[in-house]
């Protein structure tokens, strides 16, 4: 199981890129946590503090449009330029001093969110040419593990730095992380082909071309939809956490950190093992297995028994990355290079945009129904999608329209 991981780590491009992911991930997660605390301290408003997360999430809705840019330019150049621009943008929060300045923070976070959508699409396309195909499953799993690790440790760094030096220091740290990411992208060596020169249609028409490819593809569509359903189920499960602690476990809210850490540990393990499973299982079965583990974890969290709840959090973390990694790896494999930026961005929108809606729905549900109903709904969604993936079997080869 470790052979593929060691092979990936021996690949120079993979090592350089992973370094950039870890550094920028620390900066982004630290800044997101610090921004919420910063807005809360300046305004005293819980609603405005919550708006921080919305600003970072909202640009994912424009993914198909932003992904178009990743197909019009060289991806490595685009990644370097975008990272440098975001480094400059992230210096602006140093001017935030009063409640009247929080609009600047919201603007910066929205721009960074848009930049993240763009870089995610360009990275997916660049990796398809920079990392050998047989290593992409392991590589994408390592990236997911790196993201999960930074999302666990980055907020601790952000909270500590904010307490010691204030919000501007965290913003400057994030700016530095963008500079280091740009340096990592610059060090990637790949023979990237120039964008296809052809008569350009309208931006909307080219965007639709990417959406059409994904939606008509018999392999991509179900895997991407399954990834989106996994994130919806995750949103329903996570919003029940505090009700679970209060009503089910009778533990303080701070105990959520324990469950989050256990789930994060499971996600790291899930990412590290994804490549090995992809070599042994068809991708639709791996996605189905991940969703099944998630469903079992959600059911376990509904028992109200502490050891079982902890085990359930571990199962959720273990299973959730597999449908996401399976969808991403298949997008890279099944998409023509000149469409890859648009298709990758569209896939990310379909997978991650529903998360925000699920969080809103879950927040409303948890105030009106027993938290176990919410966990049962999350488990039901997971096992239903898993069954559909398993039953449909391996799809027929895709033949693009002529």
Give residue spans per PLM region.
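Substrate-agnostic recognition of the 12-TM MFS/MFS-like secondary transporter fold
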Residues: 16-32, 55-68, 74-86, 104-163, ...
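C-terminal transmembrane bundle of multi-pass solute transporters/carriers
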Residues: 50-52, 61-66, 70-72, 76-85, ...
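Helix-loop boundary and gating motifs at the non-cytosolic
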Residues: 2-58, 212, 216-263
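Membrane-interface helix-capping segments at transmembrane helix termini in multi-pass transporters
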Residues: 37-50, 91-114, 134, 138, ...
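Flexible cytoplasmic inter-helical loops of multi-pass small-molecule transporters
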Residues: 186-212, 398-402
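Hydrophobic alpha-helical transmembrane segments
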Residues: 15, 19, 50, 80, 102-113, 119, 138-194, 237, ...
């Amino acid at each position: 199981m470790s052979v593929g991981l060691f092979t990936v780590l021996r690949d120079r491009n993979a090592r350089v890129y992973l370094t950039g992911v870890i550094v920028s991930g620390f900066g982004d997660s630290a800044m997101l946590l610090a921004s919420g605390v910063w807005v809360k301290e300046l305004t005293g408003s819980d609603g405005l503090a919550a708006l921080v997360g919305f600003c970072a999430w909202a640009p994912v809705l424009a993914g198909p449009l932003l992904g178009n840019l990743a197909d019009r330019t060289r991806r490595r150049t685009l990644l370097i330029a975008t990272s440098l621009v975001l480094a400059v943008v992230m210096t602006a929060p140093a001017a935030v001093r009063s409640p009247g300045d929080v609009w600047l923070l919201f603007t910066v976070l929205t721009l960074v969110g848009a930049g993240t959508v763009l870089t995610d699409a360009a990275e997916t396309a660049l990796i398809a040419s920079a990392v050998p195909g047989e290593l992409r499953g392991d590589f994408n799993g390592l990236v997911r593990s790196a993201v999960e690790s930074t999302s666990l440790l980055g907020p601790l760094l952000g909270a500590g730095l904010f307490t010691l030096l204030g919000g501007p220091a965290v913003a400057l740290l994030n700016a530095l992380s963008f500079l280091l990411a740009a340096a990592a992208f610059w060090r990637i060596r790949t023979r990237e082909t120039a964008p296809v020169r052809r008569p350009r249609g309208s931006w909307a028409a080219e965007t639709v071309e990417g959406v059409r490819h994904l939606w008509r593809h018999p392999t991509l569509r179900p895997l991407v939809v399954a990834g989106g359903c996994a994130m919806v189920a995750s949103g329903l499960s996570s919003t029940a956490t505090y009700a679970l602690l209060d009503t089910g476990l009778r533990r303080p809210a701070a105990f959520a950190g324990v469950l989050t850490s256990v789930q994060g540990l499971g996600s790291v393990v899930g990412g590290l093992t994804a490549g090995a499973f992809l070599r042994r299982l068809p991708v639709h079965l791996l996605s189905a297995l991940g969703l099944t583990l998630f469903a079992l974890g959600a059911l376990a969290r509904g028992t109200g028994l502490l050891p079982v709840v902890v085990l359930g959090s571990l199962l959720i973390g273990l299973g959730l990355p597999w449908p996401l990694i399976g969808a991403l790896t298949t997008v890279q494999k099944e998409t023509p290079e000149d469409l890859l930026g648009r298709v990758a961005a569209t896939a990310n929108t379909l997978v991650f945009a529903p998360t925000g809606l699920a969080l809103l729905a879950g927040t409303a549900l948890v105030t009106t129904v027993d938290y176990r109903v919410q966990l049962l709904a999350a488990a039901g969604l997971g096992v239903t999608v898993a069954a559909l993936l398993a039953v449909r079997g391996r799809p027929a080869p895709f033949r693009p329209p002529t």
